[in-house]
Every structure is written in C-alpha cells, then in structure tokens.
C-alpha cells in the first residue's frame, strides 16, 4: 500500500430488514388487518415483521386469554411463506408497554395507568399468566425470530391517557429472565431511543450529571436497555416535533444517528451483543410533518447501510398503505439496506 495507507474496513453484513405492523392501525381506519398485512408482505417482501401481542387485547378480562388476533396475523404470514421464496419471520413484542399509541396497552381492569399501580398489576397472577402463556404458545413456532420484551420500557412517554408508565427495573429483570427460562432458544431484546447525537450519548453513559445539566431533548436509556436485553433495539427518528436542528439536512441528521449506532454497536460488541434499528423513520411525523420525504427515506437507507446493524425495521406502514409512492419508497429502501456491500454515503 502506498504511503502507509490502511485498507478500508470491510462493509458490515447486510441486515435483516422488515417493518412493524399493528392491527390497531387497520382497525382504526376501518380496514381488514389480515388484508393489510398480506398487502404489505406482497409489496415489500420483508425478512422480518414485528407484531405486538397486546396485553389488553389478549386478556380483556381477568382469568381469560384470547390469542385470536395474534394467531390470525401469524396465519397470514404462514400463508405468504407458502408461495414466497423469501421466508418471513416474526419478532413478537410482549408486555404492558407495546408499540403504537398510547404506548401502555394495559386492560382497564388492571387499574390506574401509572406507577405504582402498574407495577403491582404486573406482579399479579393475571399479568404473569398472559406473559408466560404467550411465551409458551409461540416459542416453538417456526415463524419466531426473537422476542421483544416491552417497548421503550425505561422511557417516560407522556400522553393524556397515561401517567408515569416506565417499567421498573425489577419487573424488567423478571420478564427477561422468564423469557430465557421458558424459551432459551430465542433472544429477548428491548428498545429505547437515544440522544440527538453521539456526544450526548457519551455524556449520558459516562458523565450522567453533566448530561442532565445539558439536555434539552429526549434522551432515552440505551446503556440500561443494552445491559438488560440480549440485543439493543434503537428507535431512531430524524424529523419530528422533538427533533433539534431541523435546519440541517435529513442526510446530516441521519449521519448523526449512524454515528450513534456505531458507538452503541461497539458497546454492544464488548458484551457479546448486537444493535438493531427497531424503528427506522419511513414516513413523515403525523402531527408535525416537517419536510421528511420519500427521497429522504432512501437517503437514510443508504446511510444506515454503512452502519453495523443486524436488524432494521421500518416504521410507517399506515402511510405506505395510503400512498403507493411511499409503499414503493419503502420497498426500495429495503433493497438498499439489503445490498451485499456498503453503498456510498450521500452528501451531507
């Protein structure tokens, strides 16, 4: 090599790619969840689909469990796999905290939607029956890729229907241990978001008191989530109402997130773990659309393809179902993320 130049690092292996789907989306829009999921599978040809097993839908009354909703969605995927060359697998999300508004999906009979009552409900026999029965029911499914335990459990998500809904560390320890006990063959991961750039992530991990004094934006709990689960799932949004520096290009903001992924991947590797991008923005923010476009989605995909990720799940299927241009962009983004070698990063 001339001038002592080092050879470039080999590109990261292509991640498994897919999307998150909730039947609540289709029900709210007066659509058929099975039809919508089938459409998404056919159009995007994913490797993975993340599905929720909602506590409130599964255990509408104490002592009664009904897995009909989840079973129907899994059957849609099984039907798809019978004729598809790419076999789709699922990540099942279980717990009181699950993805999609209002974040805490606890049944009304469980009591007030906040701590400490939430913690007491999760220690009760009914919640634990739901949790254990879900693990036992699906652990032998050939569709199962992994479990996600709770959704952003350490993060406070404020809304008008929920109070302090963070899951206690003790409860998370029990749930992860229970998943390992009842299903040692599949990983149990959990999720969070991060600060808006890697410098603040570093401060949070190493100088917490300084970070607390500096922060003005949601920070998440990536260090705690990494320590808790078998992999770290990051939910990353580059354009929304809480996004600082919206004057910067989406490509630049995405590159900041990619730097954070590399930082947390190094931390994960030291623990024998990996990082997943469990929510990659693939739609404009609903209440504050900003300027996130379908082209920005493709830019983000090219940036993230150069990051060390094992799983990437796009977020925004309700937009794709309503707009063919977004469905096409999502499909193209998955193709970019699957490229066998890293792609040139776009200009910032």
For each predicted feature, which ranges?
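Aromatic-lined substrate-binding rim segments of carbohydrate-active enzymes
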Residues: 33-108, 162-191, 250-257, 300
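An active-site-proximal structural segment forming one wall of the substrate-binding cleft
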Residues: 39-44, 69-89, 111-149, 171-178, ...
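Active-site groove signature of glycoside hydrolases
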Residues: 54-55, 95-102, 127-163, 313
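Substrate-binding cleft of secreted/luminal carbohydrate-active enzymes
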Residues: 89, 273-347
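Glycoside hydrolase catalytic-domain groove-lining segments
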Residues: 166-170, 174-177, 181-287
């Amino acid at each position: 090599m001339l001038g002592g130049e080092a050879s470039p690092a080999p590109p990261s292996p292509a991640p498994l790619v897919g999307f998150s789907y909730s039947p609540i989306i289709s029900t709210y829009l007066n659509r058929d969840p099975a039809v919508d999921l089938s459409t998404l599978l056919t159009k995007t040809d994913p490797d993975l689909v993340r599905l929720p097993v909602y506590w409130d839908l599964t255990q509408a009354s104490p002592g009664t469990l009904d897995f009909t909703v989840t079973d129907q969605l899994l059957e849609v995927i099984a039907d798809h796999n019978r004729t598809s060359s790419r076999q789709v697998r699922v990540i099942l999300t279980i717990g009181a905290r699950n993805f999609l508004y209002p974040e805490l999906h606890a049944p009304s009979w469980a009591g007030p939607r906040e701590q400490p009552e939430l913690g007491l409900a999760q220690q009760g026999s009914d919640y634990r029956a739901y949790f254990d029965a879900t693990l036992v029911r699906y652990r032998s499914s050939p569709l199962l890729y992994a479990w996600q335990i709770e959704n952003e459990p350490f993060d406070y998500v404020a809304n008008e229907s929920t109070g302090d809904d963070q899951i206690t560390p003790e409860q998370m320890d029990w749930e992860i241990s229970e998943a390992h006990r009842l299903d040692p063959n599949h990983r149990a991961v959990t999720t969070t978001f991060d600060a808006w750039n890697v410098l603040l992530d570093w401060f949070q991990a190493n100088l917490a008191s300084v970070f607390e004094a500096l922060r003005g934006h949601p920070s998440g709990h990536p260090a705690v989530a990494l320590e808790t689960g078998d992999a770290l799932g990051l939910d990353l949004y580059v354009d929304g109402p809480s996004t600082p520096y919206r004057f910067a290009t989406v490509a630049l903001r995405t590159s900041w997130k990619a730097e954070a992924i590399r930082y947390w991947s190094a931390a994960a590797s030291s623990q024998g773990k990996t990082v997943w991008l469990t929510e990659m923005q693939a739609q404009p923010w609903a209440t504050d659309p900003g300027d996130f476009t379908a082209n920005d989605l493709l830019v983000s995909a090219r940036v993230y393809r150069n990051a060390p990720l094992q799983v990437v799940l796009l977020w925004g299927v309700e937009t794709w179902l309503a707009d063919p241009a977004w469905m096409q962009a999502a499909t193209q983004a998955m193709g970019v993320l699957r490229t066998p070698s890293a792609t040139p990063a776009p200009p910032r």
